[in-house]
């Protein structure tokens, strides 16, 4: 005689992914002071975050082409198109360890778009990005989180990502990183161009590894004047506007320049970062940002 229990029966059922609680996309965290958290969520809500949540939920219900990367699916949902020459697209190596470095003019769009370009050529792509953008379950295999928090858990997360990044390259894959670590910003609120923060020296460790080729990419453009002014007033207001800036760029082309891949293994550690930054900004449009311009938050800004 066969006996059965409800527990045994439940064990036979296929696992069903549970919906994530709370907003999937937000730059706020429960650990933030109440005022900062409230400001970020309020501005995000007013500037389009809910639309991205709906876009994501609707996308989850659609059938997907298994051959398309998460990056390609995302830019399809956002209506982004590529403005890049076939010659420069052909510079992406099809095999071997590849470090991709780029300026960071927009925020979310930059990572998705460069991820899409790389995934159009090869499938072994990972992107280092802000940990708060790693919430969608479907994207987690393609992302390596950097936690910008100040606590020990944040430091552990970032240290683990650095270890995995080195390992990923050593295994012969593609790693995308924005060495500035934050969205490009005008040096003064009304300046014409937006520049990256100082590039992080960690990329020298990656670029100088034996056999690694480094591909410099320049993404043209900048965020709105509203974002630039906000960045000189409040860090919380700045990050809260990222979804507004992403919405502004939807259904538009993204202009990208790609340099020839290079090997940096024989370069001095102190030279690599500045050289790669200069190589990236050398592809800027006439009158565009220059490598020597570096944005830093005013002392009054509490990051």
Sequence positions of predicted segments:
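Non-catalytic C-terminal accessory region of glycerolipid acyltransferases
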Residues: 2-6, 158-303
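Membrane-anchoring hydrophobic helices of lipid-metabolizing enzymes
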Residues: 2-101, 111-113, 120-124, 249, ...
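Catalytic core of membrane glycerolipid acyltransferases/transacylases, capturing the structured
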Residues: 50-54, 99-154
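Residue-level signal for well-ordered alpha-helical scaffold segments within enzymatic catalytic domains
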Residues: 73, 113-116, 120, 167, ...
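Short, flexible loop segments at the rims of nucleotide/cofactor-binding pockets, characterized by
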Residues: 75-80, 104, 151-156, 192-194
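Short, charged beta->alpha transition segments
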Residues: 81-90, 129-133, 162-165
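A short beta-turn/loop motif at secondary-structure boundaries
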Residues: 89-93, 135, 188-189
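Generic beta-strand structural signal
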Residues: 98, 123-126, 142, 165, ...
